[in-house]
Amino acid sequence: MTLEYIYIFIFFWGAFFISCLLIFLSYFLVYQESDIEKNSAYECGFQPFEDTRSKFNVRYYLIAILFMIFDLEIMYLFPWSISISTGSFFGVWAIFLFLIILTVGFIYEWQKGALEWD
């Protein structure tokens, strides 16, 4: 291993060791006994009026996935835009094909009604 990467190696293993140590300590040092106050009603002393688990519409998850897809698109476009001056013609066509695939996917989602909130 060259000396250029030794600091990254040390940082990685140090972070790994510290996180494992904290997880290990949290399991053994925490007070895990449940008492009456923790299991009692929480809505101003009354019994709960409804189930605490609220149901989310599936469309929220769909919008979150679409956001992640287009967020990843931006993540790929920023490095490409910085390296465009040193890139070749192949790089331009590769990103053009990437954008076309994403655009076709977006049009497909739009026509299937994935973006409609009926």
From Swiss-Prot:
Q: Which reaction does it catalyse?
A: a ubiquinone + NADH + 5 H(+)(in) = a ubiquinol + NAD(+) + 4 H(+)(out)
Give the record's membrane topology. Answer: Multi-pass membrane protein
Q: Which UniProt keywords apply?
A: Electron transport, Membrane, Mitochondrion, NAD, Respiratory chain, Translocase, Transmembrane, Transmembrane helix, Transport, Ubiquinone
InterPro entries documented for this protein = NAD(P)H_OxRDtase_bac/plastid, NADH_UbQ/plastoQ_OxRdtase_su3, NDAH_ubi_oxred_su3_sf
**Gene3D superfamilies found in the cross-reference section:** NADH:ubiquinone/plastoquinone oxidoreductase, chain 3 (1.20.58.1610)
Stated EC number for the protein is: 7.1.1.2
Its family remark reads: Belongs to the complex I subunit 3 family.
* Name of the protein: NADH-ubiquinone oxidoreductase chain 3
